[in-house]
Amino acid sequence: MTQPITAPPQPELATAVPPAESKATNDEKSAFFTAADDAAIRPFEFHASDEELADLWRRIEATRWPDRETVADDTQGVQLATMQKLAAYWANEYDWRKCEAQLNALPNFITEIDGLDVHFIHVRSKHPNALPVIVTHGWPGSVVEQLKIIGPLTDPTAHGGSAADAFDVVIPSIPGYGFSARPTETGWNPPRIANAWVTLMKRLGYTRFVAQGGDWGALITEIMGAIAPPELIAIHTNMASTVPPEVFDALRADQGPPVGLGDDERWAYERLDLFFRHGIAYAQQMGQRPQTLYGIADSPVGLAAFFLDHDILSYRMIARAFDGVAEGVTRDDVLDNITVTWLTNTALSGARLYWEALPRTSPGFGIERTNARFFEPIGVKVPIAVSAFPDELNQAPRSWAERAYPKLIHYNRLPKGGHFAAFEQPGFLVDEMRAGFSSVR
């Protein structure tokens, strides 16, 4: 008689042993440990066991590969050759311990907000009068995305800036992502997360702060700007929600762009049209049936392929990295992010954020069933800075930004970069945050 298959237990998020006093070794199974449970803000470290890493390599090596795609390009999805190069590097050359050491060298913490343990990195600047900023990642992401910008933001004098550019940096893990707890109930949607971030910043003692984000982080940040708590003085986004209603009407009608669009606006329309026609499948799956994605929780290569297929330009950039042509994002960057998700078993809990955010009243599919609030103005009330990267899937022409944001304080179109700005072009993003928030310091 076969034994029933049961789900593995969730890793404990806390023990009574502070990191500095821990006796944990790489051979022990516990991956998470923090300080005393009754502390409001508890120190945190993450240590994957040797067994967990061996299991990861074993699963990669045991991948059952499909046939090659029947086309010569990526129109059928992530290409076999790319995934085999990624798997070979992941199993034979990639070193997770480097990323782990980099993460644990930073001040990491856990605090309970609204019944859920939330992880965050908190780095204070040595410079007086540093401006506090909360920076939020997106999907498929984790706090690993923002590691490159921490030093330049907190220590600007060592990175080409002045002391007046300094920030205190707070980088939380979205609930269900990375090192934050996985929600066990419904309701952890972007507005709830936005309110949690306000609570976090106030808990840290900040009575005046700014916020920044891309992807889900952009939406969460803009919702914070719409809620407009008195402590939030401005926000910055690298994926602005500016699409006018007549443009969405034209996309839904599938009758071409509205009459009278300028060159930048037409380009933005064409990028959105391309995305809704050929790039939105991942979001539709997660928005409607996230729990069906068991394969990405069981197969590391399956998880990696699903993550790579975010948008066409990002996929092609990542594919070139595994061909030896790094354009800001390296192979290790890509695998650091994927490995965080694998080791924390947060592939499905992260996917559920799309389900939480998706309107459940619309009977249609396609554009009607996607989370349009990623792209439509939501009534930001605080000053906002916008950075438009040319390879972002959702373009934000200046005319749309001026229309969407009555308190637009900064707008700039960058010469290069795409959806993962903090990963791809950290220097540009840091410069944009310095410039964008300069008028509110």
Each model region followed by its residue ranges:
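The serine-hydrolase catalytic nucleophile loop
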Residues: 139-151
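Glycine-rich "HGGG/HGxG" loop immediately N-terminal to the catalytic nucleophile
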Residues: 96-98, 161, 174-188, 222
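Non-catalytic accessory segments flanking enzyme active sites
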Residues: 51-125, 129, 333, 342-345, ...
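Conserved hydrolase catalytic core segment
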Residues: 152, 156-159, 207-256
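Conserved alpha/beta-hydrolase
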Residues: 153-179
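Conserved acidic catalytic loop of the alpha/beta-hydrolase fold
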Residues: 191-209
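Short beta-strand element of the alpha/beta-hydrolase
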Residues: 130-138
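C-terminal subdomain of alpha/beta-hydrolase-fold enzymes, centered on the catalytic histidine
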Residues: 285-441
